[in-house]
């Protein structure tokens, strides 16, 4: 007789991972959570809104995971997974409510799964949302031993008449960029071709550790700004860099004019460019040091930057909006 374990699925290791995961997930629970992990579904009670709209987003971490495999560091990519989802729904003014994750692997190692979910829980705490469920799939023969994939799904909420959709953006509005923590979770297929030795020294650390810096979560500072200012549009700078993402906030035909010298380019991007990538391709692939962009009235710009600094963020006036063709112009 052949057992499930002999086929490559270790149920006991699965039980162990669930127990380890529960202690991390419970730290994220907020008022709306109605049940513990282990049920068939997660339940969340909606807060009192006049005309609520649910806003959802899903994403993964991509080939940044390969850096984590090779560095044997597993507790940061969970933060990336949350960040990629909650920063997207934040662009429409939505407050994150809850999150679900999905982890797939060839051979389940409970301690590794627990480190992954520790990162997810950390990201949920940073974004003030609850981790209410997930799935860990052991798929022998499908993934190589030591490899895994992680993806997530976030749900947030906004008042219908407060949704940010770019419809109020005007000619002459300014663009404020909030600093990133590095490449975040995009461009890693290119990075892996450029950087072979992850243990090479870079700025006093191994370059592999620099490349694993988790994606910054912008929820707390941006939600505070939304309480004070008329923010007309927002963009999460992910795959495709400035060119792909900034125009996504425009409902009408505008062009974003970005001054490349308006903020300091982090050293990691200059290093990657020195390895043979053209500057224009850098801006079309990476966030280049700006992870989130706000479109606001010019009169509010100075105060917003001041508030960001007080909240521990770095904000810069990086450009302005003019009539155009849903494009980006770098100067």
UniProtKB/Swiss-Prot annotation:
Reaction(s) catalysed (UniProt annotation): 2-formamido-N(1)-(5-O-phospho-beta-D-ribosyl)acetamidine + ATP = 5-amino-1-(5-phospho-beta-D-ribosyl)imidazole + ADP + phosphate + H(+)
Matching CDD domains: PurM (cd02196)
Gene of this entry: purM
Record carries keyword Oxidoreductase: no
Region forming the signal peptide: none
A Pfam match: AIRS
Pathway: Purine metabolism; IMP biosynthesis via de novo pathway; 5-amino-1-(5-phospho-D-ribosyl)imidazole from N(2)-formyl-N(1)-(5-phospho-D-ribosyl)glycinamide: step 2/2
Major localization listed first in the record, in broad terms: cytoplasm
Enzyme kind, highest EC tier: ligase
NCBIfam families: purM
Native organism: Clostridium botulinum (strain Loch Maree / Type A3)
Record keywords: ATP-binding, Cytoplasm, Ligase, Nucleotide-binding, Purine biosynthesis
GO biological process, one term: adenine biosynthetic process
EC number(s) per entry: 6.3.3.1
Gene Ontology cellular component list: cytosol
Keyword set includes Hydrolase: no
Protein localization: Cytoplasm
Gene3D superfamilies in UniProt: PurM-like C-terminal domain (3.90.650.10), PurM-like, N-terminal domain (3.30.1330.10)
Protein name (record): Phosphoribosylformylglycinamidine cyclo-ligase
GO molecular function per UniProt: ATP binding; phosphoribosylamine-glycine ligase activity; phosphoribosylformylglycinamidine cyclo-ligase activity
Family of the protein in this entry: Belongs to the AIR synthase family.
Record-linked InterPro entries: PurM-like_C_dom (IPR010918), PurM-like_C_sf (IPR036676), PurM-like_N (IPR016188), PurM-like_N_sf (IPR036921), PurM_cligase (IPR004733)
Biological classification of the source: Bacteria, Bacillati, Bacillota, Clostridia, Eubacteriales
């Amino acid at each position: 007789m052949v057992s499930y374990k002999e086929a490559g699925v270790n149920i006991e290791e699965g039980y162990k991972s669930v127990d380890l995961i529960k202690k991390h997930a419970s730290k994220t629970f907020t008022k709306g959570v109605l049940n513990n992990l282990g049920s068939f579904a997660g339940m969340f009670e909606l807060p009192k809104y006049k005309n609520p709209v649910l806003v959802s987003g899903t994403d993964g971490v991509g080939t940044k995971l390969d850096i984590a495999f090779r560095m044997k560091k597993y507790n940061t990519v969970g933060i990336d997974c949350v960040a990629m989802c909650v920063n997207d729904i934040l662009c429409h003014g939505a407050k994150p409510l809850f999150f679900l994750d999905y982890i797939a692997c060839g051979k389940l190692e409970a301690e590794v799964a627990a480190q992954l979910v520790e990162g997810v829980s950390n990201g949920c705490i940073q974004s003030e949302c609850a981790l209410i469920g997930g799935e860990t799939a052991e798929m022998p023969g499908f993934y190589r031993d030591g490899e895994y994939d992680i993806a997530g799904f976030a749900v947030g909420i906004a008042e219908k008449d407060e949704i940010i959709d770019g419809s109020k953006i005007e000619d002459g509005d300014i663009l404020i960029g909030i600093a990133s923590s590095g490449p975040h979770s995009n461009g890693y297929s290119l990075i892996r071709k450029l950087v072979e030795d992850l243990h090479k020294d870079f700025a006093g650390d191994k370059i592999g550790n620099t490349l694993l810096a988790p994606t910054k979560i912008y929820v707390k500072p941006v939600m505070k700004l939304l309480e004070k200012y008329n923010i007309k549009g927002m963009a999460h700078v992910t795959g495709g860099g400035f060119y792909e993402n900034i125009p996504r906030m425009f409902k009408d035909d505008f062009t974003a004019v970005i001054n490349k010298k308006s903020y300091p380019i982090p050293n990691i991007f200059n290093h990657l460019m020195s390895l043979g990538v053209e500057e224009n391709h850098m801006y079309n692939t990476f966030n280049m040091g700006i992870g989130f962009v706000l479109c606001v009235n010019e009169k509010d710009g100075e105060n917003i930057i001041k508030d960001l600094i007080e909240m521990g963020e770095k904000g810069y006036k990086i450009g302005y909006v003019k009539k155009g063709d849903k494009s980006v112009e770098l100067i």
